[in-house]
Swiss-Prot record:
CDD domains: ABC_cobalt_CbiO_domain1 (cd03225). It is a peripheral membrane protein. This is Energy-coupling factor transporter ATP-binding protein EcfA. Its main location: membrane. The gene is ecfA. Gene3D superfamilies: P-loop containing nucleotide triphosphate hydrolases. It comes from Syntrophomonas wolfei subsp. wolfei (strain DSM 2245B / Goettingen).
Length: 273
């Protein structure tokens, strides 16, 4: 579990905190989404989860290890994998398998274990056939898959995705979400997805909304997403399916506003045919 207690963070020479009095437990086997408009503190929180930043006040503990403990920081960063929006910033080699092997090599693992981890990680993201390719010639979605594989080769318990799909086309987003679902369900990886896009958050177990550096609400997609007024007040764009339901309801066919899935929407409409 990642335990956050009374967390406040100030950037150097800033008078106002980027995060203020955050307390949150990220549970085992959880798919957690952190939402918020730009400047709400989401990316700052991501960097605090694995010790890239250290709290100004309060504490962050990863499986009982305090991120402020210099003796534990390497173990914490192995446990908490962090993925950013631009994969080019995390790809460093001229060959896919070399890039994925970089992390395990730095752990001092033997050659056989490194090979096993590289193969397993590429298989998890369905990129085995690209192991000898140059990352520069891959699509944005494929590059992000390789970045995920590189993180997963470190065998993290937690995967933090900081706007990791924001620069990817719709097809690439679907492919990466499939990989993330697989990691969560089959590998037991705790997923912490930081985004402003509700479409990426529909499968979350819980949703945390940040506003001006504070936790505004903790809810579930089923509770929060149908409320267009609440979402707009939080600076979040409602799901496209919510717009469709609202338009249909204006035509006199009264559909449930709780529907979040297009297949369920079609099924509901068929009841009126």
């Amino acid at each position: 579990m990642i335990s956050i207690r009374d967390l406040t963070y100030f950037y150097p020479e800033e008078d106002l905190p980027a995060l203020k009095n955050i307390s949150l437990d990220i549970r085992e086997n959880e798919f957690l989404v952190i939402l918020g408009r730009n400047g709400s503190g989401k990316s700052t929180l991501a960097r605090l989860l694995n010790g890239l930043l250290l709290p100004s006040q309060g504490k962050v503990e990863v499986d009982g290890w305090n991120t402020a403990d210099a003796n534990q920081i390497q173990l914490i960063r192995q446990r908490v994998g962090l993925l950013f929006s631009n994969p080019d910033n995390q790809l460093i080699s001229n060959q896919v398998e070399e890039d994925v092997a970089f992390g395990p090599e730095n752990l001092g693992l033997n050659t056989a274990e490194i090979r096993r981890r590289v193969n397993d990680s590429l298989r998890l993201v369905s990129m085995e056939s690209y192991k000898n390719s140059a990352p520069a010639f891959l699509s944005g979605g494929q590059k992000q898959k390789i970045a995920i594989a590189g993180v997963m080769a470190m065998k993290p318990r937690y995967l933090v995705l900081d706007e990791a799909l924001s620069m990817i086309d719709p097809r690439g987003k679907r492919e990466i979400m499939e990989s993330i679902r697989s990691l969560h369900k089959t590998e037991g990886v705790v997923v912490i997805m930081i985004t402003h896009d509700l479409e990426e958050a529909r499968e979350a177990d819980r949703v945390v909304v940040l506003e001006e550096g504070e936790v505004k609400t903790i809810s579930t997609p089923e509770e929060l997403f149908p409320s267009r007024a609440s979402l707009l007040a939080l600076g979040l764009a409602p799901l496209e399916i919510s717009h469709i339901i609202a338009e249909i309801n204006r035509q006199g066919i009264l559909l449930s506003t709780d529907i979040l899935d297009i297949d369920k929407l079609v099924e509901e409409i068929c009841h009126f045919v």
